[in-house]
Amino acid sequence: SDDVRRLARASWSGRDRSALYRVDLLWGQHGFRACEINADCPGGHNEALGLPLLSQAAGFWSGINPTAVIDKLCQELISLTQGHGAIALIYATAYAEDLQVCALVQRELQRRGATALLAPPTALRRKGKGLCIGKQSVSVLYRYFPTEYMEGQRNLSAILDAVSSGSVKT
């Protein structure tokens, strides 16, 4: 749709070059096989936090710790704020599993001293060249929400303007 393309162009114009994907793997006779790649709302963060303990309990003591994604995500989001404004964690309020992921990210951001807000995408409002939620200015937008669900949203122009101008980072 036009709105989806406009959102993608706004992120590109705002110099957003980051992406987070989840690849689901199944173990079979011939090793691991990918069964799904989730690029729009890749969850599993909460579940992954338990993998090191489960692996160690099963006797696997070497290997790569997959839980580094939360640390790296939080570091990147905090650096994008450049010391001002909040990080808005936008999620689909109808899905408890989406809230679960965003609440985990919020908790980890707050533990590091960042201001992180949980909100639906419709809560974003224009504030000058940027965005706000309530009275809180937003400097970073983490969208854990399918782009196509934003189609026709009343505040879409405000989001597009803020992101494409670089006033709000994604």
Where are the regions a protein language model picked out?
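Intrinsically disordered, low-complexity boundary segments flanking structured domains
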Residues: L7-A8, W12, S157-L160
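Conserved metal-phosphate-binding beta-hairpin within the catalytic cores
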Residues: R9-C41
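Domain-scale recognition of functional cores that engage charged ligands
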Residues: L26-G28, H45-E47, P52-T170
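Low-complexity, highly charged intrinsically disordered N-terminal segments
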Residues: S1-L7
